[in-house]
């Protein structure tokens, strides 16, 4: 996950990146009656509260703040329901529970069947929980102030003349060097907060960061800013996976469901809808 509380609380194709517990299962083992569930006949899904867009949508209701995971709207809500359908569950058979981000991948028993909450796979986390294969590969993105010249750019080539800000040692920095190749050296900062401040103060024309961070920057940190676009890459290797109790055989069945959603184009359609069109982060080429 990106290092900001708002988005966990990133777009590239969601190609299969295997994680701990990341094998697929036979059809018979994944029949609804054979699934290893917290409550028989019900799929219990965890996520944090508040539930923020574009990962979740719908209006704030009852126990849920900002958005409502039960709406089926927003990227992660839509993915969860698509997986549930492949496993044989109706929408009414899916129960959402509140699980604080940091406890979702902590060691020990789980009250959920899987948790979906912009959780990045890491080897350390995978030692104590199972991860599904990737359902989202984190892209890089570019943030600009509205009304500036760069805000009219629609291709990567059009970014070359501008002063780009970035945190040193990040995949964002590497992407600038390898792909954008600006005509002037990027402004490099020790922290992302410093790079954000430079954009806010007009010292740079744009900020390059991962997409989840870009959502946070535009929503909270830099007034009158927007995501100009995202870059067609998953090259950083960072990806989000659903989290399960360690050893839960349901992991393999969810991987099988994800494989089907990737193969029939459903996962890409969900991503295009909620992270490009609705969220206003078009892909720049």
List where the protein language model places each region:
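Bacterial lipoprotein signal-peptidase II cleavage site
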Residues: 8-21
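Extracytoplasmic small-molecule ligand-binding "clamshell" domains
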Residues: 25-115
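Bilobed "Venus flytrap"/periplasmic-binding protein-like clamshell domains
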Residues: 45, 50-52, 70-87, 119-123, ...
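Extended ligand-binding regions for polar small-molecule ligands
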Residues: 79-81, 86, 163, 170, ...
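Acidic, polar ligand-binding/catalytic clefts
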Residues: 92-158
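A ligand-binding cleft/hinge motif common to bilobed small-molecule-binding domains
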Residues: 103, 119-128, 177-178, 200, ...
């Amino acid at each position: 996950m990106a290092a900001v509380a708002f988005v966990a609380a990133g777009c590239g194709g969601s190609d299969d990146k295997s994680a701990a517990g990341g094998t697929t299962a036979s059809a018979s083992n994944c029949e609804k009656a054979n699934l290893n569930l917290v409550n028989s006949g019900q799929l219990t899904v965890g996520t944090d509260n508040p539930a923020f867009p574009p990962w979740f949508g719908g209006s704030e209701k009852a126990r849920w703040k900002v958005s409502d995971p039960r709406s089926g709207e927003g990227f992660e809500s839509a993915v969860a329901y698509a997986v549930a359908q492949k496993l044989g569950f109706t929408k009414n058979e899916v129960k959402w529970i509140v699980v604080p981000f940091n406890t979702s991948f902590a060691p020990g028993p789980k009250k959920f069947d899987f948790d979906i909450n912009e959780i990045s796979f890491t080897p350390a986390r995978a030692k104590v929980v199972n991860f599904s294969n990737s359902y989202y590969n984190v892209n890089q993105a570019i943030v600009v102030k509205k009304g500036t010249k760069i805000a009219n750019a629609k291709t990567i080539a059009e970014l070359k003349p501008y002063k780009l800000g970035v945190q040193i040692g990040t995949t964002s920095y590497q992407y600038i060097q390898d792909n954008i190749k600006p005509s002037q050296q990027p402004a490099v900062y020790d922290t992302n907060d410093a790079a954000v401040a430079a954009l806010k103060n007009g010292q740079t024309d744009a900020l390059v960061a991962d997409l989840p961070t870009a959502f946070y920057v535009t929503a909270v940190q830099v007034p009158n800013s927007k995501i100009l676009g995202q870059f067609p890459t998953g090259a950083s290797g960072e990806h989000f996976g659903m989290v399960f109790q360690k050893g839960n055989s349901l992991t393999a069945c969810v991987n099988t469901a994800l494989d089907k959603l990737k193969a029939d184009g459903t996962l890409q359609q969900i991503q295009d809808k909620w992270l490009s069109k609705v969220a206003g982060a078009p892909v720049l080429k």
